[in-house]
Amino acid sequence: MKKSLLSLAVIAVSLSACDTTPKYNINGTITGGEANNVYLLQRQGRTIDTLAKAPVAEGKFKLTGSVAGLTPAFIVVEGQRGGDLIFVENADFTANLNLENPTASKIEGTATQGIANQYTAISNEMGKMAKELNQSYRTAYQEKDEAKMKELQEQYENLMKDYEAKEDAINKANADSYVAAYILAGKLYEYDYEKLVEKFNTLGENAKATEPGKTIADRIQKLSAVAVGQVAPDFTLNTPDGKPLSMHSIKGKVKVIDFWASWCGPCRGENPNVVKMYEKFHPKGLEILSVSLDEDKDAWLKAIEDDKLTWNH
């Protein structure tokens, strides 16, 4: 019996030793607050997958697991908003999370994570300065100090230019990295076609071949169909009386497609100017097609009537 137990123990140890599956190990500490659990979460489209979960004991935790390849994820502390970006690989990481001052948190462990930390650093710096400018702008607005407001607006624009220049420098130094493609993919809807193509062309071939790189390429292909100089693709929507109306069926020398909604304050505020433009130029061949984002048909119809929008809807 003793020999059998000994044999089983030897087998168990041997099997354990033979387990060569690559794993990631994230050893972390939490300061500036308390927490019960920490999660490693991955965003997949509109869903969020839990890759790992670990309890927090005496301010420490350890997340372990295995990934098939480089995986962007977030370390999220239970009960806290947001999370810390980590590019998970089967390697060892350290994560020092500061709940009181999240910008002081830091994750280290791989070359890829080191590149990501460069982006995080300039983002945190920009965020701090933007917050200060915003607070000053609110004060100037309350005091109706238009000169100060203009000055602060110029400072903000310069801050954004400086941030983009720093980001471009990191991109240039790491053009072929997964992180460079990932950062750009997160800004798909901030750039028009020309700007996105310009940014994409700074990436290396390996970066372009990553999943975020492919996402950017797909976006560029879609934007190319509506780029300046291209024939706008046709689409068909129902009019207020329920009849289908295609964009190409509207004939005019110049066509304006106006996206709006009854609940959109800036849209409604601009409508009087659009009405004036239509009344002035419609006799010369201007046509307008307003595309509403309303889900409430009654609110849509009422806004059309109230704002005296007499063109195509």
Each PLM stretch: what is its role?
Residues G269-N312:
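Structural microenvironment flanking redox-active thiols in thiol-disulfide oxidoreductases
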Residues K195-G204, V231-T239:
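Alpha-helical repeat scaffolds
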Residues C18-A165:
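A non-transmembrane, solvent-exposed segment enriched in polar/low-complexity residues
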Residues A173, S177, E190, N206-K214:
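Short solvent-exposed coil/turn linkers within tandem alpha-helical repeat scaffolds
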Residues K214-H248:
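N-terminal "domain-start" segment that seeds a small globular fold
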Residues M1-T29:
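Bacterial Sec-dependent N-terminal signal peptides
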Residues E157-D176, E194-E198:
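Amphipathic alpha-helical coiled-coil segments
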Residues K251-K255, F259-E279:
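Conserved redox-active cysteine motifs that mediate thiol-disulfide chemistry
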